[in-house]
Structures are given as structure tokens and as C-alpha cells.
């Protein structure tokens, strides 16, 4: 069994267990004529507040675990693809579109980056002409079905979906400084607070989701957090990024099942797409944390090794000028390690460990569109998706004054099983029932 098969088998084993347990332009918002946001909100919320409310939960999903609905109308960027139609993008999509091939979806979800460096970075990104992307069912649990076991568990303890369990979805191509994420999510949290008897809201994030929650917590006032936030449960947060994302700029990655492409055309379309996504760089290991502790890319011709500290050199040697520019801005984008960026709310973090985890690959060269030989993977301890360096990076939060910081290591529990793990869920429930810290 190669590494790709092993990872996918683990994904599916986790997902099957989850299914059984569960029972079944510019990107920045601009009111000027002709501009639009990349994702538009669709959805509404249920009515009257509960009596004797429970601590409400807002879930921040993992990378590509939020449903995106893509509408294509008279596109010309990919003449070999349908000119019009719709498809959805989300991990484990159970009804994938057959009109738009994976290559077509990659090309249509590739962002256009304005070369004008005088513009603020978030305003330089737009969709391909003729392509619009919406967050499907924003705020609702059906927008992130992977977490159904979490919803079912909370329901068994008195919670009601879409009333005191809500989902702060986002376009996983983008970083939290874009597309009105902050304003949209603040509004969702405040609405949840008021509709549940003015009860502070608990944030639960998984994988990349905690990065978006952390961005929110460090871009709101302490007074706002004191009023609206009960606490924060990050589950396997991808804090300083992960090493395995660096090969993706050359090999691509199919997010419908998190497997690497098996043909050169798909590898090229996917790798090129990820080079244009700001979140790719936010998800790539930050040299400030990783330094030279792991090899992320090793080439055969010429024989050369790259660590996270060499990331700019990697892109320079590959001739990827856009990647060089975006990496300089977005690698290490969400700050967390210094006291100025501590969340200053109660934190109950979870991680997995004890599983050999790929952190890099050996590639033939630095050409874009390579089909991966998984026997070349470099591994270290982790949760199958993220290495120990990533998962342990928030240990610095134990120095956060007054607020609680608890960090639980779930040995042998993989990244994708953590949100449905019985012990994790029981701790979450116990923490939801605890009073929040009152700090000066």
C-alpha cells in the first residue's frame, strides 16, 4: 500500500465511523459599481430565543469542509470546459458534478491576481470572468456535513441545529482578511448570542478553521470578546502551517478526497490553481516556527533539499514569481505566538499524535504538474495530516494570563477522527458547561 492509499484509507475509515456515529474586481467588499464579493451569503436563521439557554456553539470548519456553490455563466477562460453550469466544491462531496471535469473545476476556481502591487493585497484577487462562488447555507449545519457526529452529540445533550449550533463557513481558497469574513462572522456570533438569551458563544474550530477563529479573536476588542465569547476549542489547529503543502505547488491536490492527482493534466491544473490561492501560503509551514527542522521538498535533478526556511528559494528556483510574492505576504499570516496575539479567551485545545505523518516529498525536479511517487515521502510524528511542530505550536498560550489554557494530547487519534472522538466530545461538553473566566 502506498502512502496515498494509506492516507485515503484512514480518511475513509474515519469518515465511515463518523457516518455510523452520526446516523446517517476585488475580493474585499466594495460598494463601488461593478465590484462584488467572492462569496455571497445564502441562508436564514430560526426564530425565538430559548429559555434557559445552553452555551451556543459556532463551528469553524477545516480546509474545504465548507460547501461552495460555483456558478459558471459564459466563461471563456477554459474553452474546452462547459461555458455555463454549476458545481459544488467540498471535501467528500457525495454528488460530484459530471459535466465539469476535475481539470475544468481547477481552472475555473483558479483566482485572477491583479499585478498592480500598489493595491492592498486582499483587493488584488478575483474570480475568473463568468464565475461566481457562494457559501452554500452559510451559518447552518448543513453547510459542513462532515461534522454531523458533533451535531448529533450536541443534540443528544439538548442542543438544536441552526439555533445554538451554527457554522461559520468560509471560502477555503481565501484568507480571513478577505471576502467580508470578519464582518460576516462577527454578525453570526452576535446573532447567535442574542437569539440564545444573550449567552456568550463558544468557538469550535478544526484544522484550518482555528486560523479563521484566531484571526477573529485578534481583530476584535477585548470588550467585545468579554461580552460575546465563552471560549475557544481548537481541534488540531494548523497554526504555523504544514510541510506537506509545499509539494502541492508542484503536484496539486484534489480536495474532494484529499488525494494527489494521478495524471499530469490534473496535476498541472491543480498545482497552478493552488499557486493563486492565498490560503495555500497560510497553510504552508512558517519558517519562523519550523526553521530547518524538516525537509519539505527534495529534488532528484538537480539534487537539492529545501526546508521551510528555504521556501523563497524554492519558489525562486522553480521560476514561480507569483508564489514568491504571495508567500512573502501570506506564509505565517495568522499571528498567534507572541503575547500581543494571544486570543485572551479560555482555550481548550485538542491534538492527535503517535501517527507517522508525511511532511514533504522527493520530486524529480521543480516542474509544475508532476505525478507523485509516494514512496519518497518524508515523515515525522503527527496526526496523519499535520506534524507535531504544527500541532504543538500553541503551547506558548500556557503563558496567557488569567484565561484558562488546557491542551489535550489524543495519542493514536488521527486528524479526521478527532472531531467525532468520544473523549474529545465529552471534554467539549464539560467545557461548554463551565463558567467563563472573568479577567481584567
How would you label these PLM feature ranges?
Residues 2-12:
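Bacterial N-terminal signal peptides that target proteins for export
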Residues 2-4, 41, 216, 333:
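Short secondary-structure boundary micro-motifs
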Residues 10-22:
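Bacterial N-terminal signal peptides
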Residues 17, 25-27, 65, 357:
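Generic "edge-of-domain/loop-turn" microfeature
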Residues 19, 48, 194, 340-341:
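Sterically constrained small-residue positions within well-ordered secondary structures
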Residues 27-204, 208-268, 276, 283, ...:
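N-terminal non-catalytic accessory region
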Residues 256-325:
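Alpha/beta-hydrolase-fold enzymes
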Residues 303-440:
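C-terminal subdomain of alpha/beta-hydrolase-fold enzymes, centered on the catalytic histidine
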